[in-house]
Amino acid sequence: MEVGVYYYFHLPMEQQPDYLTFTQQFGGSDAPVPSVMDLILLQKGARLDFPVQIGPRSPHSIALDWENPPRNDRTYWKERREWMKQRREALLGVTSYSATYAYLYLEPREIRFEILVPLLTLETWLPLQREEADYLSVAEQDAMEKALPGFLQEVCQTHIDGMEIIAQLDRLDFFTLDIRDFAKKQERKKVGVANARVGMILSFPTKGNFQSASLEWSFFNEVTPLLNTMTYVFDQPGERFFFTDNERTWQWQSPKHASGPQVSSWLSLPPVPSMPTMPLSLLFLLAAFSGGAFALKRNWKIAVPLLVLGAWFGWWNPVWQQMVIPHPTKEAPLPTPPEQNKIAEVLLRNIYRSFDYLQDADVYSALSRSADGDYLEKLYLQIKKGLILTEQGGAHSRVRNVQWLESEPTSHSMRAQSFSLSVKWEITGTVEHWGHIHTRRNAYRAELEVKAVDDEWKLVDLEVLDEDQVESSTQLRGSA
């Protein structure tokens, strides 16, 4: 038997709230047949949105626009559709406050599974005792963070090239309704249970290019009968996948003959000018003639054999003819200012390319082609620090573009075959989370020194004087 009850609530408000959250538990928590409530919300007498069905323990939140409230005229719903499109962009695709969103990323460094779930939904996965019925304290959030890894490792299994990789809970954040950018690290504070959302990031590290991967999600209940997931494979457009009780596993196989993302091509450096040399035989000739001339003044019988011996070593001996020594009075020419600019630019671009590699040993090996060994560790830490976005919870930015702006010579040493420049460049990097892309462009001004080491140009010092953020933007990741 079906029974319907109609209620009309009029809510006077002293202030204009940005959000309203509705919950219902008609029939109590032990009702044999769960109740369903149709919610129709009116703002200033006009319907705000389409009717929404709300089940038990399924809160529904809605944003209120007081500057452009709903109207009853016919053009309103056409404007509403355009507004909803703009709102989707503003909310970065997360348009429902009560839905669960999941994002699966295949990247060269890791496989990453990100889940954004209402707190009340999460409590149906992993029950947690609360001191207050309507709030979750910071201590209780910390307790949830300790309990979640074990639960997630049971319900989420991942294999890379046939080997099981244990899930690591990298981040756990608790969001309120006013949060737009879920990638930003949140300070923990007491949150309301009815409208809080939980963001969790699971990572599965890789050891280089891989050929196959699979992820299985095995937890489903009445509140979460499926897990709506956007999958992003490297730089390809996103595709939607639904984890269900009948289809628990998502699988990926690398296309035939593919070997995964490759490191950007290496740029060639101009050669180091050769040091001026002189034949070793010429040194013997000079020594012989000098000694012979000195001996000739005293005893010609000694001078003649000395001249003959010096001539044989210096001129007729083929071994000494092939040997050379640095010229005592000449020095190697330094590159011209345009050539110095080119050398510094190529070195800097190759240094950033080194961080396309996955393992630290490979990064170091690539860096050694552009920097002197004594400077490697400092350079590695310096560049890596610049690629980490602290506001995104320590995420590693992927370099998309290196734009060389200008350089100006400051000093040089012909004998040491070194030169110094004042340089400016810009780096554009991206980080992806929750279905959207963070792009950051930073400008740098620095003093650098380049030196010829083992007949190759190497960076031996880099001092960053200024670092400024030129541009920062966030946009939705495209789908197929």
Positions of predicted regions on the chain:
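N-terminal soluble domains immediately following signal/targeting peptides that reside
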Residues: 1-279, 365, 372-375, 387-391, ...
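Secondary-structure-rich domain cores
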Residues: 110-111, 115, 202, 291-294, ...
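Juxtamembrane and targeting peptides
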Residues: 266-358
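Core segments of small alpha/beta cavity-forming domains
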Residues: 335-398
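C-terminal soluble interaction/assembly domains
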Residues: 355, 371, 395, 408-417, ...
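Hydrophobic/aromatic beta-strand elements that line small-molecule binding cavities or substrate pockets
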Residues: 401-410, 444-452
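Extracytoplasmic/periplasmic C-terminal soluble domains
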Residues: 445-480
